[in-house]
């Protein structure tokens, strides 16, 4: 199962709201993410990766869970495009959805929009090396996006801690 891909995690896994998860996703910054009001009506999803402009465009007005999953798919495309000459998102939609599924599961966002109900037919005729290559691509995308998200979210949580608590000089009157 693709959700078995895991990075080393802290002992206590923090929980995030969907809004915090979206904030972390946007902080990832492998590429710019631009929310646009005049989103193309011919697009199937609420976000897409533009390889020529090296940018993710997302539709304004979506809920946090849809923003997360749709932008996660687009960011996975951006990550994979770094290593593939002439990258075409349509050829890697399954891998990008898998990466978005893992990210959504990891950060507590609903996976309904990116659930995987079947494997593409080409995987049935692919040799083991090809499957491993695709799984490695998914893993690397998840790792890179998650790493950036985690850093941004930890930084955000640390900023919420008061300077008194941070320095350890709380109200201990010994």
Feature locations, PLM:
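Long, well-structured alpha-helical subdomains associated
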Residues: 101-164, 174
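Contiguous, non-catalytic segments that form substrate-binding/exosite surfaces or channel walls
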Residues: 1-62
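An acidic intrinsically disordered interaction segment
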Residues: 60-71, 143
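Catalytic phosphate/metal-binding cores of nucleic-acid and nucleotide-processing enzymes, i.e., regions
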Residues: 39-40, 71, 135, 140
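Active-site recognition of the HExxH zinc-binding catalytic motif
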Residues: 66-85, 96
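Active-site metal-coordination segments of metallo-dependent hydrolases
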Residues: 84-95, 105
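Hydrophobic (often cysteine-bearing) scaffold residues that line and stabilize catalytic clefts
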Residues: 18, 68, 92-95, 134, ...
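Intrinsically disordered, low-complexity linkers and terminal tails enriched in Pro/Gly
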Residues: 1-8, 159-167
